[in-house]
Regions:
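A short, well-structured juxtamembrane/interface segment
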Residues: 19-40
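Generic N-terminal amphipathic, Lys/Arg-enriched alpha-helix
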Residues: 1-21
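A ubiquitous structural signal for well-ordered alpha-helices
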Residues: 8, 15, 30-33, 59, ...
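Glycine-rich phosphate-binding loops that contact phosphosugars or nucleotide phosphates
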Residues: 45, 49-186
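Catalytic cores of large soluble enzymes that bind and process phosphate-bearing ligands
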Residues: 4, 22, 26, 163, ...
Length: 187
């Protein structure tokens, strides 16, 4: 049992090292994109599928309620919560069509597999001239292909299973810390 515990935490540490090394530039770009939108008075919309829906909600909470410092909240809305009563591939798109504006940012967290509702919401964001940050996973080639030149993709496809969610969690925390630092300064 001790060996299994050690292997579990060793894989978590290795994942953290890969995330910090391989994704630093993309994480910085994502944080800059979200920060610029917030400073311009725009909103951040988040959504995800499967277990990634929880990570999208967490990012909205970090923006709206604060991450590591006490501060005023930022305008962040989780589309999953707003689309709870809807079903089908257009459920996220319908909410985005109603509430989002050009220059807002959509952050999408995918658990993998080219989720049709996520493809649809990305297409809607493109039609509305929004910026997109995509935290993708394995088999998300259609999601990635939908992105524009100025959008940001952080692909966690090299990780498997729970390590994908762990990597995405760390990325969300890092983006949140960078946003707070860029807007409020500090260490």
């Amino acid at each position: 049992m001790d060996q299994q515990i050690f292997k579990h935490f060793q894989s978590q540490i290795e994942t953290s090292m890969v995330v910090g090394d391989a994704f630093a530039e993309s994480i910085a770009n994502a944080a800059e994109k979200v920060t610029a939108a917030l400073l311009a008075g725009n909103s951040i919309f988040t959504c995800g599928d499967k277990s990634a829906a929880l990570l999208a909600q967490l990012f909205s909470d970090y923006l709206a309620l604060g991450f590591e410092i006490e501060r005023p909240g930022f305008p962040a809305l989780n589309i999953n919560k707003m689309a709870d009563n809807n079903s089908g591939n257009q459920r996220f798109s319908q909410v985005l069509n109603i509430h989002a504006r050009s220059a807002d940012v959509l952050l999408v967290v995918s658990a993998g597999g080219n989720s049709p509702p996520l493809i649809s919401v990305i297409e809607t964001a493109i039609e509305k001239d929004m910026s997109i940050v995509l935290l993708s996973a394995a088999n998300d080639d259609l999601l990635a292909a939908s992105l524009g030149y100025n959008d940001v993709q952080i692909s966690c496809a090299e990780f498997s299973g729970q390590l994908t969610a762990a990597a995405q969690f760390q990325i969300i925390q890092c983006i949140s810390a960078l946003i707070d630092h860029q807007i409020f300064g500090g260490e």
